Curated annotation (Swiss-Prot):
Keyword annotations: Cytoplasm, Methyltransferase, rRNA processing, S-adenosyl-L-methionine, Transferase
Location in or out of the cell: Cytoplasm
Species per Swiss-Prot/TrEMBL record: Alcanivorax borkumensis (strain ATCC 700651 / DSM 11573 / NCIMB 13689 / SK2)
Name of the gene this protein is made from: rsmH
Protein known as: Ribosomal RNA small subunit methyltransferase H
Keyword hit for rRNA processing: yes
GO cellular component, one term: cytoplasm
Length: 312
């Protein structure tokens, strides 16, 4: 283990549930689209046979390094760098359809805990929030020029922040005096607009979530990979998705419903009266972390796991 691994560890969420409900073919081909520190991948490898294959994908340089280390010690595993919607390339490389795709969405504990990554409203650091800091612009860069109305829209859409307009206004007033470049500077600004008292929740929680989702194009990547999964999964292959907030979970829930022949007519982009081709079947009920897991892993509190199988 490297110093970074021990300093910023990540505890995989709902590990047993994922393996029990998602993994079935010991010689199968699996993709972990959100490798992180490989908690789910390592557990999967421990059940995978000699001819089984696993591809890990992540866009974060530290996660990629951890994956490459694993790949060097296990020939059944291969690490790919990039957004998880590079899924078709992964499948092309393997030359066979996938038996399972896992997405454990959002950020990892190492990303949140390392102040230098700029994700945390509790630790001071540069206001960045990019999962891949080599691509695109940081939150600080975006906030330096974005229109007040666009900032308010992002806070409202991705954070469900009711006072989004007030916060956006304060950001635009403040940046005339000084650039907003630090995480605590933004957290304090939001607190000065909303006040402190929010039933144990930091007032900046929703805004930080919104800015992170926006700057990383998270929901767009999710939409894309869900569509790709229909073409890349083998019949009988399973999709397992762990979401951490209602926006993500809603996208996953509607996607499964709209491809399982259960969409109300006129929904899911289909003309009224059209029959839906059934391509996915939900597996079991929506799952949440067990009481035992909640006690030892606070991150599992908001986790929601959905599994679906490709049936046609
Ligand atoms: C919750 S963590 C996954 C943790 C992992 N299951 C484990 O047990 O270590 C999410 C990971 O997915 C990555 N990620 C999130 N969205 C991504 C995307 N669109 N493309 C590629 N990686 C993404 C993040 O960089 C992060 O490392």
């Amino acid at each position: 283990m490297t110093t970074e691994d021990t300093q910023y560890a990540h505890q995989p969420v709902m590990l047993e549930e994922v393996l029990d409900m998602w993994f079935s073919q010991s010689e199968g081909f699996y993709v972990d689209g959100t490798f992180g520190r490989g908690g789910h991948s390592r557990a999967l490898l421990s059940r995978l046979g000699e001819n089984g294959r696993l591809i890990g994908i992540d866009r974060d340089p530290q996660a990629i390094a951890a994956g490459q280390q694993l790949a060097a010690s296990d020939s059944r595993f291969h690490m790919m760098a990039g957004r998880f919607d590079c899924l078709p390339q992964a499948v092309e490389q393997a030359g066979r359809p996938i038996d399972g795709l896992l997405l454990d969405l959002g950020v990892s504990s190492p990303q949140l805990d390392d102040a230098a990554r700029g994700f945390s409203f509790l630790r001071d650091g540069p206001l960045d929030m990019r999962m891949d800091p080599t691509q695109g612009e940081s939150v600080a860069e975006w906030l330096s020029y974005a229109a007040e109305k666009d900032i308010a829209n992002v806070l409202y859409r991705y954070g469900e922040e009711r006072k989004s307009r007030w916060i956006a206004k304060r950001i635009c007033e403040t940046r005339k005096e000084q650039p907003i470049t630090r995480t605590l500077q933004l957290a304090d600004l939001i607190e000065s607009v909303l006040g402190r008292n929010e039933q144990g929740k930091h007032p900046a929680t929703r805004s930080f979530q919104a800015l992170r989702i926006h700057i990383n194009g998270e929901l767009d990547a999710l939409d894309q990979v869900l569509e790709q999964s229909l073409e890349t999964l083998a019949i009988g292959g399973r999709l397992a998705i762990i979401s951490f907030h209602s926006l993500e979970d809603r996208i996953v829930k509607l996607f499964i419903r709209d491809h399982s022949g259960r969409a109300p007519k006129g929904r899911g982009g289909l003309p009224l009266g059209d029959e839906l081709p059934q391509r996915l079947e939900p597996v079991g009920k929506v799952m949440r972390a067990s009481k035992a897991e909640l006690k030892v892993n606070v991150r599992s509190r908001s986790a929601v796991l959905r599994i679906a199988e490709k049936v046609a």
